[in-house]
Amino acid sequence: ESPSPLEDPGCVGLMENMKQDEHGFLFHYLLPFSENRFLLEVTRFTPEKVPWDRMEHDLAGALEGYGFSHAVEKRREKGILPMGLPTQKQPTGPRWAIAGTRGGAIRPATGYAFQRIAEWAESCARSIAEDGCVLSQPCFPRSIRWMDDLFLRLLRGKPELGPQLFMRFAGRLSPGQ
């Protein structure tokens, strides 16, 4: 929470301040909730785990960069999203399901999963209500897995291209996407 109002509380910052350094590809999400409340997420896209003290340093720098060095922290989360994991063998039987991260819900090249998990949960609940069967998380199509694998291999081999590649992708999206 910021003691002074945000510059534009109606503007969301997605993948801002992108840069590549010795710890990987870094960017920020800034999601305002009101004139003075916001969520600031510092994200690292890297094949190696980044030490938490480095992430704390990155967060302090982001707060200062946005002019929020006097903000009051109300809640903190931290986590690691494993990306590019091999697809797990799906169990058989009406009472078993693999879902979420282990079920392949995370898009390997982006880390996004929320919409896929929500859609799976809805169809799984409907299936349970209709015939008592639990559904596993559906796999991404082979073409998507191939493209994401190619993208991740490119980033591993040439990590300095991260900001440029993500900006190129973002430039081709509409606001609704």
Language-model regions: role of each:
Residues 37-38:
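Hydrophobic residues embedded in beta-strands of well-ordered beta-sheets
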Residues 8, 68-73, 176-177:
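Short, surface-exposed acidic
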Residues 31-34:
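A short, hydrophobic, proline-anchored segment that marks a local hinge/packing element in signaling
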Residues 24-27:
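Short, surface-exposed coil-to-beta transition loops
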Residues 20-22, 46-124:
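FAD/FMN-dependent oxidoreductases across multiple families
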Residues 1-15, 68, 79-82:
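Central beta-strand plus flanking loop segment that forms part of the substrate or channel wall
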Residues 122-177:
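C-terminal helical "tail/cap" subdomain of flavin- and related membrane-associated enzymes
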